[in-house]
Amino acid sequence: MKNNNLILKPFDFQNLPFLLDVVVPLWSPSLGDEFFKRFNVEYIIRNNIWENDFRFELLDENQKFLAAAFFARKGDECNAQNWFLNESKRFPLDFLVASKMSKTFLDFMDEKTFALMNDDDIKLSLFISKERGAGCEILERTLKMLSAQGWKNLFLWTDCECNWQWYFKHGFTLVCEDVYKPFCRENEDYKTYIFKRKLM
């Protein structure tokens, strides 16, 4: 998606529903109605949006939303829990077990990834594309900018339910492969992966 008229700008939270439209079909828990499924997926997304200036969206020349990318430095904070405490009140406690399992997993993998990073490294916490090719385009633009700012390496984690093989084809090196036992099924390991890519 090479287009010189595309616009990279700070992420506007009003565009969060576009991200939900993409990933709700992919990330929804098995229990609950459509409102809970959307709530749970929004909680996952918000856990990947950190309090910093490294939150971006890509628009076309007509201001149509195409993609978003979110990054985190060591020491950054995430305020998703405040949102969760307020929004979760409308759902039964047994539903919220799924949300807490997601949160535990996200925190575990974030901490594991941050532990591998130096202070001049940065983590890609999430990128979502609404249009084919827009994901690669927003990554190309943001990584070029991060490199110019002096960030040395980009880290990210993913799991076996995502297209983890994609990263091998786009300049990333696998630095850790493991199994997350709470999500394992009988005769099927739930594998996690941490990747790294040099920015400088």
Task: Tell me the role of every PLM-derived stretch.
Residues 118-122, 147-159:
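Conserved GNAT acetyl-CoA-binding A-motif
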Residues 136, 148, 160-178:
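Conserved active-site alpha-helix within GNAT-family acetyltransferase domains
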Residues 155-157, 173-190:
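Conserved catalytic-core motifs of GNAT/GCN5-like acyltransferases
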Residues 4-6, 62-68, 122:
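Glycine-rich phosphate/pyrophosphate-binding loop shared by adenosine-nucleotide-utilizing enzymes
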Residues 131-145:
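Conserved acetyl-CoA-binding loop-helix of GNAT-fold acetyltransferases
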Residues 73-126, 182-187:
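Conserved acyl-donor/pantetheine-binding loop and adjacent beta-alpha core of acyl/acetyltransferases
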Residues 4-21, 73-74:
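A short beta-loop-alpha structural element at the N-terminal edge
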Residues 33-56, 61-65, 70:
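Active-site rim helix/loop that mediates acceptor-substrate recognition in acyltransferases
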